[in-house]
């Protein structure tokens, strides 16, 4: 019986799992500041993919849309529908670019973790991964969302916006304030946790069963990555709509 070789292979697999590093970062020293290079590099790649795809698809608009133009028109219509549903038919127009930018950046970032061979690029420390695999990125996406819904409420209602904090009774003031300031935390940690967990599960399964098991898990990861992008964009639009309506 080949019990001993199997045991050795199992131990090797467990050893490889223990070598999966989380939180290792590569920094650029710019002036007196340390800049998180991994996030910048992968974010620039994602932005380049988005800009390049859009430029190629719509560089020569046709009355009868081509396949690329048709696809981007469908994406735009989808984003408009999400914004209209959550914000309202009268108010959604100016917010479509913001919601669309969030959705597309998060969607492509999430998918890049599974589809782009980041690990081919060797770094002195750590390794490249999806931008949304890093808490810095998800917090950077959540904070402008918070600014956006405060701006939307103040623009629509002026200082009367803050009256919602004492509705329906002033006793709820601390809870209402806490609710607004925990929204960016829930947005950022939900996205970060799901994407990081997905990539770690794939790494662990690849180290144990390299050929068969990881493939369906990767497809499931692509599906959940798209859902996470939709959830983030939908919640951002819902928060903006809620701030302008003034009720929960």
Curated annotation (Swiss-Prot):
Give any GO molecular function from the UniProt entry.
proton-transporting ATP synthase activity, rotational mechanism
Q: Where in the cell is it found?
A: Plastid, Chloroplast thylakoid membrane
Query: Keyword set for this entry?
Result: ATP synthesis, CF(0), Chloroplast, Hydrogen ion transport, Ion transport, Membrane, Plastid, Thylakoid, Transmembrane, Transmembrane helix, Transport
Classify the main location: plastid
Please give the GO cellular component terms listed in this UniProt entry. chloroplast thylakoid membrane; plasma membrane; proton-transporting ATP synthase complex
Say yes or no: keyword Chloroplast present: yes
Chain ranges passing through the membrane: 38-58, 96-116, 135-155, 200-220, 221-241
For membrane topology, the record states:
Multi-pass membrane protein
Q: What does this protein do?
A: Key component of the proton channel; it plays a direct role in the translocation of protons across the membrane.
- Family per record: Belongs to the ATPase A chain family.
Quaternary structure and interacting proteins, as annotated: F-type ATPases have 2 components, CF(1) - the catalytic core - and CF(0) - the membrane proton channel. CF(1) has five subunits: alpha(3), beta(3), gamma(1), delta(1), epsilon(1). CF(0) has four main subunits: a, b, b' and c.
**Name of the protein in its database record:** ATP synthase subunit a, chloroplastic
Task: Give the organism the record lists.
Answer: Nymphaea alba (White water-lily)
């Amino acid at each position: 019986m080949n019990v001993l070789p199997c045991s050795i292979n199992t131990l090797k697999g467990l050893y490889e799992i223990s070598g999966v590093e989380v939180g290792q970062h590569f920094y650029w020293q710019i002036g007196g500041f340390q800049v998180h290079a991994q996030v910048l590099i992968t974010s620039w790649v994602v932005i380049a993919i988005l800009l390049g795809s859009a430029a190629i698809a719509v560089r020569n608009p046709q009355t009868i849309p081509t396949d690329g133009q048709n696809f981007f028109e469908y994406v735009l219509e989808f984003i408009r529908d999400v914004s209209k549903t959550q914000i309202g038919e009268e108010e959604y127009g100016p917010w479509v670019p913001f919601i669309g930018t969030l959705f597309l950046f998060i969607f492509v970032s999430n998918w890049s973790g599974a589809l782009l061979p980041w690990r081919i690029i060797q770094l002195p420390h750590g390794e490249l991964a999806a931008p949304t695999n890093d808490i810095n990125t998800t917090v950077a996406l959540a904070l402008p969302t918070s600014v956006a819904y405060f701006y939307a409420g103040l623009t629509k209602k002026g200082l009367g916006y803050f009256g919602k904090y004492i509705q329906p009774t002033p006793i709820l003031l601390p809870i209402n304030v806490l609710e607004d300031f925990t929204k960016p935390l829930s947005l950022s940690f939900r996205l970060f946790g799901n994407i990081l967990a997905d990539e770690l599960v794939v790494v662990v399964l690849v180290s144990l069963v390299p050929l068969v098991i990881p493939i369906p898990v990767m497809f499931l990861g692509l599906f959940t990555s798209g859902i996470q992008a939709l959830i983030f964009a939908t919640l951002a639009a819902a928060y903006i709509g809620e701030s302008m309506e003034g009720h929960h």
